[in-house]
């Protein structure tokens, strides 16, 4: 059987400040494309690994429209099952109760299921597929049948080889998850950038990133979905049709980011001349910044991540 794994949806009708297009219309179009892709590829279910909505305050009209679109997908010729975990954006005040939330209303208005420690089971012609869930802050459950194709949908920060920012601690690497032999597939959410990792024995960690690009920081992100075949245990990645980044974001903001990234790269390259063996490296670095022509925006960023303001002056 085939399963579609999507990224964080962050459904909302609010346009991010640097977007220039009709954001909600784009969100609807991508949502429809995902459902259509699942139907065209005979998927039996779609896994939504958390942050289905952008906030628990999502307007009723958005929730109502998502119920309508989801029902059309569920009631089609194939009858696709939508399976969900919750992210921190889906719940009120960081609790685990989704009942009085947009996600809870979506579940009540459709045949969707909230995944948990008890598996949602597909027979798959005698080759059972068990799908579990671990929402934001929840522990990963123990599978009840090691002979089944066990899949876990989870909302946690999964990264590649390196932290996303200096000092990041609350994460797990995709390689670490691949060492966990309990699950054939980890369908993850939370990280808005794509992370894919696989073994030669066809174990996979899939984090598709966000469906929508909401910030300039996602300059290099390509929205996509993952198609998983439980029989072959193979995955394939498919890009969601989307406009070029410069067509939907403010041009001056893009130019500023590119310029800042370039200056930071130049600064990092210039740091090779700083003696890293000195006892007080932060002080030496601050002195270097004061005696060299370092752009103000680069200085600001360095100060934020190193807390070096105290060395200035």
Q: At which residue positions do the language-model features occur?
A:
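Non-catalytic terminal accessory segments
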Residues: 244-313
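Active-site neighborhood of phospho(di)ester-bond hydrolases with catalytic His/Asp-centered motifs
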Residues: 5-7, 45-51, 81-88, 113-118, ...
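Core catalytic region of metal-dependent phosphoesterases/phosphodiesterases
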Residues: 9, 16-121
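Mobile, glycine- and charge-enriched loop segments
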Residues: 1-25, 140-160, 284-298, 302, ...
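Short, conserved loop/helix-junction motifs that constitute active-site signature segments
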Residues: 73-78, 144-146, 177-182, 200
């Amino acid at each position: 059987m085939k399963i579609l794994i999507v990224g964080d949806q962050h459904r909302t009708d609010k346009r991010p400040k640097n977007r220039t297009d009709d954001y909600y219309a784009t969100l609807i179009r991508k949502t429809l494309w995902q459902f259509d892709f699942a139907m065209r590829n005979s998927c039996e279910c779609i896994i939504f690994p958390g942050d289905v909505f952008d906030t628990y305050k999502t307007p009723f009209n958005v929730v109502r429209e998502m119920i309508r679109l989801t029902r059309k997908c569920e009631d089609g010729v194939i009858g696709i099952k939508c399976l969900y975990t919750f992210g921190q954006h889906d719940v009120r005040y960081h609790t685990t109760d989704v009942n009085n939330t947009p996600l809870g209303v979506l579940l009540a208005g459709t045949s969707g299921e909230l995944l948990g420690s008890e598996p949602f089971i597909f027979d798959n012609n005698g080759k059972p597929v068990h799908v579990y869930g671990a929402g934001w802050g929840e522990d990963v459950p123990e599978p009840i049948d090691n002979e089944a194709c066990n899949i876990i949908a989870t909302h946690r920060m999964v990264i590649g080889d390196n932290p996303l920012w200096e000092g990041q601690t609350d994460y797990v690497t995709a390689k670490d998850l691949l060492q966990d032999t309990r699950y054939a597939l980890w369908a993850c959410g939370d990280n808005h950038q794509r992370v894919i990792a696989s073994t030669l024995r066809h174990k996979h960690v899939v984090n598709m990133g966000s469906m929508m690009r909401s910030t300039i920081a996602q300059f290099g992100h390509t929205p996509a979905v993952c198609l998983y075949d439980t029989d072959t245990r193979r995955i394939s990645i498919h890009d969601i049709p989307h406009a070029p980044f410069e067509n939907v974001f403010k041009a001056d903001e893009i130019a500023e980011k590119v310029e800042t990234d370039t200056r930071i790269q130049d600064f990092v390259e210039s740091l090779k001349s700083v003696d890293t063996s000195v006892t007080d490296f932060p002080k030496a670095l601050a002195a270097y910044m004061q005696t060299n022509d370092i752009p103000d925006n680069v200085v600001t960023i360095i100060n934020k991540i190193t807390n070096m303001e105290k060395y200035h002056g």
